[in-house]
């Protein structure tokens, strides 16, 4: 901070900066990638970094009081998902609400059959290209406020869809 404080409180929220991360965001690099092979290489390197992150998380022993979101079936599409009841958004039109409820039901059903077979552990949960910095091939993940326990495919799906 300007005052050399490592933890800053603003409007009841706390912010920290550990160190500056050099490089460009993945979104910037993808927008300026000259060749499809460059994009392929970026995603390849990202996959390696993500696997290393998940493996490190599996080898980490969290402190006894460690609590994070659960991005499991209930946390994603249950009655009280982590990010709220998306189907109850007051801005939705009736047919949009109906569609989201239908998708929620389908996802709930699909995950009920898959959840025991999917790799589950600590995930980033917000791995969008703006939260990935790349500097001379070195990949750094940013913004861990949504980090929690969930399906590892969630991280892969997020980076591919965003």
Regions found by a protein language model. Name each.
Residues 153-162:
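Active-site activation/catalytic loop segments of kinase-like enzymes and analogous catalytic loops
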Residues 44-47, 104, 124, 157:
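Generic structural concept
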Residues 25, 50, 54-57, 61, ...:
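Short, well-ordered alpha-helical segments in soluble proteins
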Residues 1-62:
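ATP-binding pocket architecture of kinase catalytic cores
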């Amino acid at each position: 901070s300007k005052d050399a404080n490592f933890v800053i409180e603003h409007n009841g929220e706390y912010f920290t900066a550990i160190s500056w991360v050099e490089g460009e965001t993945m979104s910037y690099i993808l927008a300026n990638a000259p060749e499809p092979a460059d994009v392929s290489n970026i995603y390849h390197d990202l996959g390696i970094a993500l696997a290393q992150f998940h493996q490190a998380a599996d080898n980490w022993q969290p402190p006894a009081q460690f609590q994070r979101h659960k991005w499991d079936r209930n946390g994603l599409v249950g009655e009280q998902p982590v990010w709220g009841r998306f189907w109850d958004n007051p801005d939705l039109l009736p047919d949009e609400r109906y569609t989201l409820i239908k998708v929620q039901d389908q996802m709930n059903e699909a995950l009920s059959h898959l959840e025991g077979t999917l790799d589950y552990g600590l995930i980033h949960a917000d791995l969008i290209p703006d939260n990935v910095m790349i500097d001379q091939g070195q990949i750094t993940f940013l913004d861990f406020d949504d980090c929690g326990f969930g399906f590892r495919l969630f991280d892969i799906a997020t980076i591919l869809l965003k």
